[in-house]
Amino acid sequence: MSGPERITLAMTGASGAQYGLRLLDCLVQEEREVHFLISKAAQLVMATETDVALPAKPQAMQAFLTEYCGAAAGQIRVFGQNDWMAPPASGSSAPNAMVICPCSTGTLSAVATGACNNLIERAADVALKERRPLVLVPREAPFSSIHLENMLKLSNLGAVILPAAPGFYHQPQSVEDLVDFVVARILNTLGIPQDMLPRWGEQHLVSDE
């Protein structure tokens, strides 16, 4: 199996809930164990942007997402924001990588300054201190100088800043194609196989030169 086997996926309150849900589905399809964290703001955004209504309690949410993604029992583990005994809170038991998708600029700021006010922020802090892959997927426009400074700081610390900015060279035909573009880039960054998006040049079979 290439890429990390255990991944923390956090969703925060930026627009773009579809990205997080699609990424979760893809990770399940690739037989990864996912530790799922979600902020209250992200739950509100998800209810606004999708037809997915997550239960409030972690145990009920875990059962819902397991059925929603067709996951095996125990493949998706959901932890509350104040569950400080959860594996992502400790460097000795945290998953091999973490993705925050979508990542709000508030969460971006908290991670950049080392704040650990909730489990999402603590899990990101653990990923940084343990030098494990950390991918942040901000969805904001325009970016302020503060946002850009926080991104630069995190990039210098080893995190990957992967904005939710779809490309168009694959000629997308639907919103789902645009979502898949970003999710495919996340999977590529983690080293996890994906067949949603051809790599540049793969479909270029004939040259005029």
From Swiss-Prot:
Flavin prenyltransferase that catalyzes the synthesis of the prenylated FMN cofactor (prenyl-FMN) for 4-hydroxy-3-polyprenylbenzoic acid decarboxylase UbiD. The prenyltransferase is metal-independent and links a dimethylallyl moiety from dimethylallyl monophosphate (DMAP) to the flavin N5 and C6 atoms of FMN. Keywords: Flavoprotein, FMN, Prenyltransferase, Transferase. It is an enzyme of class 2 (transferase). This is Flavin prenyltransferase UbiX. GO terms for molecular function: carboxy-lyase activity; flavin prenyltransferase activity; prenyltransferase activity. The keyword Hydrolase does not apply. Disulfide bonds: none annotated. FMN binds at G13, A14, S15, S39, S104, T105, G106, T107, C116, R139. Its EC number is 2.5.1.129. InterPro entries: Flavin_trans-like, Flavoprotein, UbiX-like. The gene is ubiX.
